[in-house]
A protein has these predicted regions:
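Conserved active-site helix of classical SDR/Rossmann-fold NAD(P)-dependent CH-OH oxidoreductases
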Residues: 48-55, 85-88, 116-117
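Heptad-repeat alpha-helical coiled-coil signaling segments
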Residues: 72, 76, 105-107
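Residue(s) in the substrate-gating loop at a strand-loop-helix junction
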Residues: 18
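Generic structural signal for alpha-helix termini and adjacent loop/cap motifs
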Residues: 4, 8, 25, 60, ...
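Short, conserved SAM-binding segment of the class I
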Residues: 1-4, 151
């Protein structure tokens, strides 16, 4: 897509990155200027690679690029492989929910409408964007995954059947924009 943008003389390439690029940083909140050279998953490495490619295209071809690091997006029409949908489905079906790091995970959940608003603003403000830019797109309000599950339980009026497991390789313990 970025190469097509260059060939079709698109003036501003906006792309989705991810909070996963931060890995398991201890210092929070995450800042766009933090070092992201040590991804802990292949997904994070692919997002970091996209950022590097965008930076290089921006430099070589004078193409404005803006990367948006999304933090745990949720809402209607979301991906069915993401925690909110998995948790709801499994609670409703009486199935076990696997909760990693023994329940000590935190996520900076971001509602999809907020993501759409930011994307629209970045596109509309293209003339005022610098050559290469990265933005964190989150709420700056990490929520414990167990609190999130308890909220779902309250809404559904049904208790979750939880299986606590250790952290998996590549899992990020906390995200915080």
């Amino acid at each position: 897509l970025i190469d097509a943008s260059r060939h079709f003389q698109i003036k501003h390439f906006v792309y989705a990155s991810s909070s996963s690029v931060y890995g398991n940083r201890q210092d929070v909140p995450f800042k766009e200027t933090d070092n992201v050279d040590h991804p802990i998953s292949l997904y994070a490495a692919s997002k970091k690679s996209n950022e590097l490619i965008a930076h290089t295209y921006s430099h070589l071809y004078v193409l404005k690029t803006t990367g948006l690091r999304f933090f745990t997006v949720y809402g209607p029409w979301g991906r069915p492989d993401m925690a909110p949908f998995i948790f709801v489905k499994k609670i409703l079906n009486g199935e076990k929910i696997q909760v990693f790091n023994n329940g000590n995970m935190e996520r900076d959940f971001t509602y999809v409408d907020d993501i759409i608003e930011v994307v629209n603003r970045v596109i509309q403000d293209s003339n005022n964007i610098s050559q290469y830019k990265i933005y964190n797109i989150g709420q700056s309000n990490p929520v414990k995954v167990m609190d999130f599950i308890h909220t779902i339980e309250e809404i559904l009026g049904k208790k979750a059947n939880i299986k606590y497991l250790p952290t998996r390789p590549g899992d990020v313990v906390k995200t915080y924009a």
